[in-house]
């Protein structure tokens, strides 16, 4: 962590354009004078100027072209579903579930709990490669559907609790954690910052994280009570929540993989103007070049100093920058 640079967008926001160029050059494995680096640096400057004021929590209530409220709710919903799909019920109480709900002996339950944690750790590895290649939206759908079916297997085996069915119930729990580890575990931490507008990203991320811990607390508190009341009912409950999350992800989660953050703004603005689902616009819209993003921004009426993202009288305007070198000052003025 000590060796990691600041993000180029943060450096641009603070006026450190030279440092931002160096980070972009390192990301692209090229020089600071490369056309792609200069283009992205200029586009970041433009976006930071448009969204110069830091959005308050009140700004999240906006429903205009920026779709701040919808985007905040989408980000928070990913954290809600992460918890209410049963992950921590399985993770925290895996040994107890094997022993008390599936009725395995104590020693075997401890062994299976250790194997469960090992499988969980190993199953996270594919996410490093799949998140960009497969995409966020598809992984959400795969995760929710796979988790739901896994808990249906567990529930069905526990309705008639025999020794043979207990093995099937354990398989269902293992399948659940495999699906969770490479899909719904990482995605809710990646998706909300990508989906939210630059000026409201901090406030929206705070709400998203708060949603995670509130729902985490709720699930951990009611799981033992629910499990004691109905051994198979708790798995039916979590299965239904997972299956409910599938249409939610389908209709409300546009794909963000491979997109500039500015393209996400255009997707929601275009969806607002054309009265379409954001995921439909994202599917129809090809990856845009810098010039195409500028032109679409003009076409959608988003080119006036963040007119659709900053209400009249809101904020104090762009923050004055302190530059650490003459080069940065010249870059800012030029």
Stretch-by-stretch model annotation:
Residues 26-38:
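Short intracellular "coupling" helices and adjacent cytoplasmic loop segments at the cytosolic face
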Residues 1-26, 48-334:
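Alpha-helical transmembrane bundle of multi-pass membrane proteins
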Residues 37-51:
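Cytosol/matrix-facing amphipathic helices and coiled-coil assembly/linker segments
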